[in-house]
Amino acid sequence: MKERKFFGTDGIRGKVGSGQMTPELALKLGWAAGRVLSRSGTKKVIIGKDTRISGYMFESALEAGLSAAGLNVMLMGPMPTPAVAYLTRTFRAEAGVVISASHNPYYDNGIKFFSTDGSKLDDNLELEIEAELEKPLVCVESHLLGKVSRIEDARGRYIEYCKGNFPAEHTLTGLKIVVDCAHGATYHIAPAVFRELGAEVIAIGDKPNGMNINDKVGATSMGKICETVIAESADLGIALDGDGDRIMMVNSKGEVIDGDQILYILACDAKSRGVLRGGVVGTLMSNLGLDLALQALDIPFARSKVGDRYVMELLKELDWRIGGENSGHILNLDHGTTGDGIVAGILVLAAMRRQNATLEELTSAMEMLPQVLVNVRFEGEHDPLKSDKVKAAQAQVESELGVRGRVLLRKSGTEPLIRVMVEGDDHSAVLAHANLIADAVKSAS
């Protein structure tokens, strides 16, 4: 396949005003995408965004470009990424566009597309769009220009969709939940969803100002929600990221429940109800404790490369339904086409209600093994992973760890770093093993 120039694994992303993230490129991208998407279908595109101040600028530019190509545009305003995927399906739109840089700081932004079925845009379509980007922008004739409208009830539609994933015979009455919206796209949705299901909700990170998204709050910064759960004597906490596609949780003791533990809860619940199809897909970074806990239940486990795109690919290849990353991207293909933090939280709460159990009880049988990650910078074009010294150090550590440990060495995709990850039963031993391999990598650099 031809190498992509603009699109990465999750659309286009970067610092606002530099590189590819400029209003000029957004305008041209809208036009190029419109040219490709207008060849068939409804000629209708939905645009949603998170709460970054630059979202308004990019929304206007994309809107103009799509209209210039003859496509009708429907604006949602600030809405979670999975809401764009859902409404793209229900409106039978040709595509959905999300303006977001997910968990990144406010000065970054990004643009990604969903296809008409709510899944990530096909690689070949992205290549077609890139080919159109190389051409001069030519506006359609005036009578063919696209029209722009706003979906006034997008929030209500998505709230009802989220609630529809919770069993009708149960409520959340009696639960006190802290919900952290990361000052992002879920700020006006997530608290309402859990309140309407009966919970007492304490909302934090729900006052976006355009520049505070993901700032010391949300799924990538768990300190605030852990403190709040303890201070408020809450039953649990739910932390979302800036665009609402990932989740982390907190139990009543203030302990973080990560994506691996959430996958374990969902797999156990599905198996107990006889609806688990196949097994669970994690990634190379998933904790060995998840693998061992699923083995004990005879639930198959497979690892993909890091990234929810690769988790999805492996789920489709194996025809399984549940997968995700320890960072909190959770996919359940019986409940959506992309990662959805709110829905994942609802499914965990449903498991709690069905089993009349606390979050602590649902995770008690899964032992998270100590995991140490060391980043080693290297210079030059050579590959330290091919060094005999590094290979020998890895073999020595793997031999000493046995079946209760794991070593993973991989290159960073964005920096000249080798990531050394070691897991095992004893934290001090794991740390020593990781440093042993890291020293070998340094000497080979």
Curated annotation (Swiss-Prot):
EC number(s) recorded for this UniProt protein: 5.4.2.10
Annotated Pfam families: PGM_PMM_I, PGM_PMM_II, PGM_PMM_III, PGM_PMM_IV
Cofactor details (free text): Binds 1 Mg(2+) ion per subunit.
Gene Ontology MF, one: magnesium ion binding
Cofactor(s) needed by this chain: Mg(2+)
Reactions it catalyzes: alpha-D-glucosamine 1-phosphate = D-glucosamine 6-phosphate
PTM note: Activated by phosphorylation.
Function summary: Catalyzes the conversion of glucosamine-6-phosphate to glucosamine-1-phosphate.
Family: Belongs to the phosphohexose mutase family.
PANTHER family registered for this protein in UniProt: PHOSPHOGLUCOMUTASE (ALPHA-D-GLUCOSE-1,6-BISPHOSPHATE-DEPENDENT) (PTHR42946:SF1), PHOSPHOHEXOSE MUTASE (PTHR42946)
Protein name: Phosphoglucosamine mutase
Species this protein is from: Shewanella baltica (strain OS155 / ATCC BAA-1091)
